[in-house]
Amino acid sequence: MHPVLRQMRPPPQQRQEQEQRQTCRAPSPSPTASGGATSAADAAADGDYEPPRRRARHYLDLEEGEGLARLGAPSPERHPRVQLKRDTREAYVPRQNLFRDREGEEPEEMRDRKFHAGRELRHGLNRERLLREEDFEPDARTGISPARAHVAAADLVTAYEQTVNQEINFQKSFNNHVRTLVAREEVAIGLMHLWDFVSALEQNPNSKPLMAQLFLIVQHSRDNEAFRDALLNIVEPEGRWLLDLINILQSIVVQERSLSLADKVAAINYSMLSLGKFYARKIYHTPYVPIDKEVKIEGFYMRMALKVLTLSDDLGVYRNERIHKAVSVSRRRELSDRELMHSLQRALAGTGSGDREAESYFDAGADLRWAPSRRALEAAGAGPGLAVAPARAGNVGGVEEYDEDDEYEPEDGEY
């Protein structure tokens, strides 16, 4: 109800008194009425009966208010917010990713151990087990209750499964992005130009034109500082990894033209996996690398590969090709008043011409029709002293039409 109308209503106490008086004056039921009507009349006589309209109005008043206005609800189940929460509730399981959550807080190699432990416990865990009170009593030998051990194992299995699902989604998203970018022709052209540019910059790092072009290219990558810094220092040792990545992507996308789209996506994934393993072993100086660190390095190279392909797409659209597109008349810009008056002035100035010229004046390019000079007509064979050659068949107006290949000689005084 509108707040203004709500203010015009009588106070609740006065409304209750009016409704009680109306209830007391209610007519007695007929003897032929059903038992339900008789019981309702008896309840009204005792003062416990509440008419349906009054109950509906009471619930309506409760739903209109907020906060304390809802304290008069008959039961918690009738509370609007409780009903909304019950209708929208869902089983909440907190998201976990053993590879990426709580960065810098886990002990070294603990993520790897949790991941492998969850994978091993997944087959022997009883998912239908119901914990009872005796399960929470600690064991005399280990000091750990069976319930605590079961909950810990269930947490490890849940974390393992959620980690696997999130990594699967990350890999699918990467494949879809790579497939979409590699399928574009602009990406291949832009990657070819980018590779050619970085190769020239590597051979001549002190070239000022190349450095100026490098700053222009960097303007397309503003959202990732690591990629931006590596691109600015691509000729330095700390940017060598980006140069290797561009070379690998160029060899797959540009050089191998016979590969299908799926093969190119697979080759890029294999390259990211190989680069991740190589640099992970180079960091840890050992063939054994924790799986979480290896996955993080692979994810870094995947993001950088997407940055290179996106940058190639931005560079590939800068092609000096003239685009021929038919634009409908309705999409052209209309003439301004000044342009319209100028066209009208030219139209009025050419009113004395022939009828055909007047009819075709507003055709495309009709007002820009070129008429040859007198000397050009004489040189074409009209004879000396004749200003206008005999009209050709179908030429009205006394001016002979010539092709664009005809020679043009300026008159005396023309330049």
From Swiss-Prot:
GO terms for biological process: viral DNA genome packaging; viral release from host cell. GO terms for cellular component: host cell nucleus. It comes from the Viruses. Its main location: host cell. The record marks 351-352 as: Cleavage. Transmembrane segments: none annotated. It is found in: Host nucleus. Part of the genome packaging complex composed of packaging proteins 1, 2 and 3; this complex specifically binds to the packaging sequence on the left end of viral genomic DNA and performs packaging of the viral genome. Interacts with hexon-linking protein IIIa; this interaction is required to promote correct genome packaging. All late proteins expressed from the major late promoter are produced by alternative splicing and alternative polyadenylation of the same gene giving rise to non-overlapping ORFs. A leader sequence is present in the N-terminus of all these mRNAs and is recognized by the viral shutoff protein to provide expression although conventional translation via ribosome scanning from the cap has been shut off in the host cell. Belongs to the adenoviridae packaging protein 3 family. This is Packaging protein 3. It comes from Human adenovirus C serotype 2.
